[in-house]
Design a protein with these regions (language model features):
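C-terminal "cap" of GNAT-fold acetyltransferases
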Residues: 92-112, 118-136
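Conserved G/P- and acidic residue-centered "switch" motifs that form tight phosphate/ATP-binding loops
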Residues: 73-75, 90
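Acetyl-CoA-dependent GNAT
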Residues: 1-61, 66-67, 79-81, 85, ...
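Active-site acidic-Proline motif in GNAT/NAT acetyltransferases
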Residues: 66-72, 100-101
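Alpha-helical macromolecular-interaction surfaces
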Residues: 77, 81, 103-104
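Short polybasic/polar patches that bind polyanions
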Residues: 70, 87, 110
């Protein structure tokens, strides 16, 4: 997760991500939250986290895949794992926000059934787009 923060270090508003990474596990603690780490023989190559929101909603946070591993199915595997786990926890839908310049991430979310929604968090950066996956 720290690699993601450093990769986007020049992005306005990145400070909240750095603070979040420094207080792990924070809101991602079980039983309603979780963190997954993808590893190769060389170490960590990706991560994703789940945290609870009010009303039976789970939030996907800190999705990151190392540049060298993008386009190889790592992000999809992480998200599919998170989605399956969220279902077992009883969440009825998932939400997430992603920066508008992350076209590959938006494409991945759409391929897994996430649809665009209105802004649900006021504290996210201005150029954040929001998505939701409903389990009903």
């Amino acid at each position: 997760m720290l690699a993601h923060v450093e990769e986007r270090a020049s992005t306005p508003g990145i400070e909240h991500m750095r603070a979040d990474a420094m207080r792990l596990p924070g809101p991602y603690v079980a039983p309603l939250g979780a963190i997954w780490l993808a590893e190769s023989n060389d170490g960590a190559i990706g991560c994703v986290a789940l945290r609870p929101l009010p009303g039976g909603i789970g939030e996907v946070k800190r999705m990151y895949v190392d540049r060298a591993w993008r386009g190889k199915g790592v992000g999809r595997a992480l998200l599919e794992t998170l989605i399956a786990h969220a279902r077992t926890l009883g969440y009825h839908h998932l939400r997430l926000g992603t920066l508008s310049d992350m076209a590959a991430a938006r494409s991945l979310y759409a391929s897994l059934g996430f649809a665009p929604i209105e802004r649900y968090r006021a504290d996210e950066m201005v150029d954040t787009e929001f998505y939701e996956l409903r389990f009903e």
